[in-house]
A protein has these predicted regions:
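Cysteine-nucleophile amide-bond enzymes
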Residues: 1-236
Length: 236
């Protein structure tokens, strides 16, 4: 079971004929795959930013999660982003992020209001400096491998969602705490604003899961609404 590779699928009606078609989870990320390069001016508070760097930690995360991204942050406005890193929750500039990362891509929740963006920023401010969830990250490695069984092709989305949550209950436990790793922090920030991205436990979500919540992709777990692609701030 530990060696199985997963690729989530979904059966959707064809755009023109309405006939059922089988969609596969997409790993495409580069602007050459249909994206566009943007500047930080295009960002709005609450935008979700996914990144990848060339270091060993990033490569390891991408290999384990079978994803082109390894980190997640949230845009606060005023050229600042918030993120959970090893030193804890921190706020830094977009320029600093662009200097450190090889790939930076932004997504937006279509229903996020200005008031909810303020609530997200309030959540961030109240958690700045809090500790990183090292235990959650360590548990992600075996969980990421075990869950691939649930993500085999042709597994129905509801079954896949139930399967992943079941494995998470065993591998991760069901408790909650006030320490976060990067993608968990994003999920909790949105939940605090009354706009949860999913009903699943934020601790089972990795940056790749956030990527697959985008429009036109196949999410591994059930989501409330797809994220809209904003653009790439940097591409490898």
């Amino acid at each position: 079971m530990m060696t199985l590779g997963g690729c989530a699928t979904a059966i959707k009606p064809h755009e023109t004929t309405g006939a059922p078609t089988l969609d596969f989870q997409s790993m495409a990320l580069n602007p050459s795959n249909g994206g566009e390069l943007i500047g930080a001016y295009a960002l709005q508070p609450g935008d979700i930013i996914l990144t990848a760097e060339n270091g060993l930690n990033s490569v390891g995360i991408r290999l384990i999660t079978l994803s082109p991204v390894s980190h997640a942050a949230i845009y606060m406005g005023n050229q600042q982003i918030a993120e959970a890193v090893g030193s804890g929750i921190r706020i830094r500039s977009v320029d600093a992020m662009l200097k450190d990362e090889a790939t930076v891509v932004a997504f937006r929740h279509p229903d996020l209001t200005a008031g909810q963006a303020i609530q997200i920023n309030t959540f961030v401010a109240s958690h700045e400096g809090k500790k990183y969830n090292y235990l959650g990250v360590m548990l992600q490695a075996p969980f990421a491998l075990e869950r691939r069984l649930c993500e085999l092709p042709l597994v129905p989305s509801t079954v896949r969602d139930f399967c992943i949550r079941g494995i998470a209950a065993v591998q991760l436990g069901l408790g909650r705490n006030d320490q976060f790793f990067c993608s968990q922090f994003i999920l909790e920030a949105y939940r605090s604003a009354g706009l949860p991205l999913t009903d699943a436990d934020p601790r089972l979500i990795n940056p790749g899961d956030l990527l697959h919540m985008r429009e036109g992709d196949v999410p591994s777990i059930m989501i409330h609404k797809p994220l809209k692609y904003v653009g790439h701030l940097k591409a490898a």
